Amino acid sequence: LQSIRIEGAKPHPTKLVQSAAMASVAPPHPSYRPHLPVHIIKSDILSDAQLESVIYAGDVHSGHLVGSWAVDETFDNIHAAPEGAENAVRFRRGWFLGDGTGCGKGRQVAGIILDNWIKGRRKAVWISKSDKLIEDAQRDWSALGMEQLLVQPLSRFKQGTPVRLTEGVLFVTYATLRNEPRLRQVIDWLGDGFDGVVVFDEAHAMANAAGSKGERGEQLPSQQGRAGLRLQRALPDARIVYVSATGATDVRNLAYAERLGLWGGEDFPFANRTEFVQAVEAGGVA
């Protein structure tokens, strides 16, 4: 494995491997320095591989995607805008955590949130498939020495009422986000200019976010995928983390990952999502 040397960090407790295709690509050279308590490193609470994810996420989150964008009030429609145009926004770059089973992705997510917490960004959102998984989130958060009750479910607060938390990690399910008032409730709690962490755990749950055309005709966008896109567009400065060991079974289903900067115009690797899909399908997936 090509890795970052972190002084005092302990090796991962289980053996980690990477595919030949991944090994053929040199990793980036990050300059980001996370803020984490020393005991987390020395006590092996986060392994060297898990600490790498905190560094890479922070490095990516330090910049924004190219260009300015206009988003309508529904957060459904987005288009390129001239630089300096009224109400135009810039989107912060997002990061994809695609480690497989056994890497401890929950603890990696907690580490990313804690790094930002220590830097003063004390509101975060953790989105997952099931409300029962809040226990796992609380366990991973408390493993880093934090109070587990700082992770609170959105379901604790009635729909249409303010989320009365001055700080904390709001745990939300994808099914809940499909509800427009609930989505607005989360956006209102985070507030204008929010630049904290939003985690899309099991991000493949947002598959078919943009709809598709198949042999049986046009398929409408999924409600969960659409809700995920709307949340991202409503929070342009948020530090987005996509988490999934199986990001997409079909490359078309990566439409939810707008913050990766894979498509979007002449300054991106691909002009649009269709061009990206065609290129990947033509080249094949390693």
Please give the residue ranges for each predicted region.
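Conserved helicase ATPase motor motifs in RecA-like P-loop NTPase domains
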Residues: 102, 204, 231-251, 255, ...
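SF2 helicase/translocase NTPase motor core
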Residues: 6, 13-45, 70-86, 92-96, ...
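Motif I (Walker A/P-loop) of helicase-class P-loop NTPases
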Residues: 104-114, 224, 255
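Short, well-ordered alpha-helices that flank and scaffold nucleotide-derived cofactor binding pockets
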Residues: 111-118, 139, 233, 256
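The Walker A (P-loop) glycine that initiates the GxxxxGKT/S ATP-binding motif of P-loop NTPases
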Residues: 99
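Phosphate-binding P-loop
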Residues: 61-66, 85-94, 233
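Short, solvent-exposed loop/turn and secondary-structure capping segments
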Residues: 66-69, 209-211, 252-256
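N-terminal pre-Walker A segment at the start of P-loop NTPase domains
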Residues: 47-80
